[in-house]
């Protein structure tokens, strides 16, 4: 399965104090789009968070997530490369690719 498109919507987190940097939509093989992947700045650097929902007991569960570490790494690397391409001023972020 190939990533054929990545769309990033940057969030103005500097004024709000939020750790959320952007929302991402990834298209696979021009036939499936995965929306609401989040780019988050955490204590140990920047990471992606998969779409999730809140359960009745208040826990958050992923709606979809990578099964293998290799796929997660490839997805994260592709998202980070596109994020930096669109936002070169954010090069100082600790991105793990």
From Swiss-Prot:
BP GO terms, sorted: division septum assembly; sporulation resulting in formation of a cellular spore
Domain of life: Bacteria
SUPFAM superfamilies: SpoVG-like (SSF160537)
Keyword Cell inner membrane among UniProt keywords: no
Keyword Cell cycle tagged: yes
UniProt keyword annotations, A-Z: Cell cycle, Cell division, Septation
Role of this protein: Could be involved in septation.
Similarity remark: Belongs to the SpoVG family.
UniProt protein name: Putative septation protein SpoVG
Organism: Borreliella burgdorferi (strain ATCC 35210 / DSM 4680 / CIP 102532 / B31) (Borrelia burgdorferi)
